[in-house]
A protein has these predicted regions:
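Domain-terminus/edge residues, biased toward the C-terminal soluble/receptor-binding domains
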Residues: 92-96, 108-298
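Active-site-adjacent loops and short helices of periplasmic peptidoglycan-processing enzymes
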Residues: 1-117, 127-129
């Protein structure tokens, strides 16, 4: 499904791996003309790659994402190829990206999309597995970033509320389009346990805070003692709920996957949680369509 600016997780890590963070980036008219949310880059002017990365990840500036993509990939099409190659390399076969900023798009092959499960894998790679994970975390954990441009002093503020509202979030990225709804992906750590959380379609205007309430509830549950004893289907859960009915990926495909066994909990403490009736006390704010994934990735 559409995943909005959570796309920028992959944009960031591909840029960090393929380019130097101190590169100078010249802005094209295409990048400068991107829609809000935007920094207001000026076509023909030059900016530091590091500053653009902070603008993209902290403030989610769309023009920064396009400028980065064109610099690294030669064009947005070339960069999309790099993104999709990386997605396939790390096992995200339900992901196909067209735009570096996550704005809804279609081409002759497909539409811009991912899954909650794939976004957890992408976040896991960004936070822990990439050779550039340290730089990625340094960027996404920064609460405020200041730099000087030809246009004057710029100040970026981090919009990832879970960095300050929980003790366990180490990275995250928000997103929104009218098609994707409010989205959020996060990396969580507690006592050596590493987990990722992904919410897609978690509310539409005027329910911007739904994702924060649900994400906090999921994080608190995931790091709790109760989660260690959970028996959950090890399946990527994409749930569409209308009234009292639900369907899941497993039901839709007819594929069964083994449950996580208690003796495996040292390596898989919690795989996935469905937002079904017994878990309503955990996640209660979702609207008609939602997707959640929580998982451990080592």
């Amino acid at each position: 499904m559409a995943n909005a600016s959570t796309t920028k997780l992959l944009t960031c890590i591909v840029a960090l791996e393929k380019a130097d963070i101190n590169d100078t980036v010249t802005i094209s008219q295409n990048a400068a003309s991107q829609p809000a949310v935007k920094l207001g880059l000026v076509a023909g002017n030059s900016y530091n790659m590091k500053d653009l990365l902070y603008g993209m990840m902290l403030e989610s500036f769309n023009d920064c994402a396009y400028a980065i993509a064109e610099h690294v990939g030669g064009s947005t099409e070339g960069f999309a190829k790099l993104m999709n190659e990386k997605a396939n390399e790390i096992g995200c076969f339900g992901t196909y990206f067209i735009t570096p900023n996550g704005l809804d798009a279609e081409n002759d092959i497909s539409f811009h999309h991912s899954t909650a499960g794939d976004l957890c894998v992408i976040m896991s790679y960004c936070a822990w597995k990439s050779p550039k994970s340290t730089q990625f975390l340094e960027i996404t954990q920064t609460m405020q970033y200041t730099f000087e441009t030809e246009e004057g002093k710029m100040v970026f503020n981090n919009h990832n509320r879970l960095l300050t509202e929980t003790d366990y979030c180490i990275s995250g990225k928000t997103g929104f389009t009218t098609k994707a709804g409010y989205c959020y992906v996060a990396a969580v750590e507690k006592d050596g346990r590493r987990m990722c959380l992904s919410l897609l379609g978690c509310g539409w205007p005027n329910n911007k805070n739904y994702k924060w309430a649900d994400a906090k509830s999921l994080v608190e549950y995931a790091v709790s003692d109760a989660a260690e004893d959970s028996y959950c289907d090890a399946a990527c859960v994409t749930t569409q709920q209308t009234g009292d009915t639900q369907t899941t990926d497993k039901q839709a495909t007819g594929k069964e996957t083994p449950a996580v066994k208690k003796e495996d909990k040292k390596t898989i403490n919690l795989k996935y949680i469905e937002n079904n009736k017994k878990n309503k006390k955990i996640c209660k704010n979702f609207l008609k369509n939602f997707t959640i994934n929580i998982g451990n990735f080592f």
